[in-house]
């Protein structure tokens, strides 16, 4: 029950681990076991970042860096930056027309971003 209460009020894994370590409810071995298992689970996660609607690569990199920093600090994980999707008004048009963007506008920067992402994910 104490763990459930902690989970409701704590916002980061780092905070949660600190509460477990300082809790008087658990013995030392249990504290160590819970903390090491949670850290191992967090490190096993391999989240990926794709920044959407960025104006350029520089803006996307800044956003990805900020997100990655918070993921490291609060979740103890290191996300991989896969790239970005550049903002383009024609995305809405093509969605409404029912035609794939990369077919309608293959030379647009957004189409190149989609191809780059597909390549990084192993689809090409």
Task: Give each language-model segment a name.
Residues 42, 57-60:
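Short acidic/glycine-rich loop or secondary-structure boundary segments that cap or lie
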Residues 24-35:
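A general structural motif
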Residues 59-63, 94-95:
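Short, well-ordered secondary-structure micro-motifs
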Residues 1-21:
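Phosphate/Mg2+-binding loops and adjacent switch elements
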Residues 96-106, 110-124:
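A cross-taxonomic marker for long C-terminal extensions/tails that follow the last structured domain
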Residues 44, 51-55, 71-101, 114:
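Beta-strand-loop-alpha "switch" segments that mediate conformational coupling across diverse proteins
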Residues 64-68:
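Charged helix-capping and loop-helix junction motifs
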Residues 33-46, 74-77, 124:
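A structural motif corresponding to the C-terminal end of an alpha-helix
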């Amino acid at each position: 029950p104490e763990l459930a209460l902690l989970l409701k009020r704590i916002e980061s894994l780092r905070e949660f681990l600190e509460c477990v370590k300082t809790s008087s409810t658990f013995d030392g071995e249990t504290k160590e076991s819970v903390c090491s298992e949670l850290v191992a689970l967090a490190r096993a996660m391999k989240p990926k970042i794709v920044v959407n609607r960025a104006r350029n690569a520089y803006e996307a990199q800044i956003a990805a860096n900020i997100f990655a920093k918070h993921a490291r600090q609060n979740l103890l994980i290191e996300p991989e930056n896969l790239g970005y999707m550049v903002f383009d008004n024609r995305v809405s048009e093509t969605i409404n027309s029912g035609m794939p963007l990369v077919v309608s506008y293959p030379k647009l920067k957004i189409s190149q971003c989609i191809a780059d992402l597909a390549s990084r994910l192993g689809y090409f």
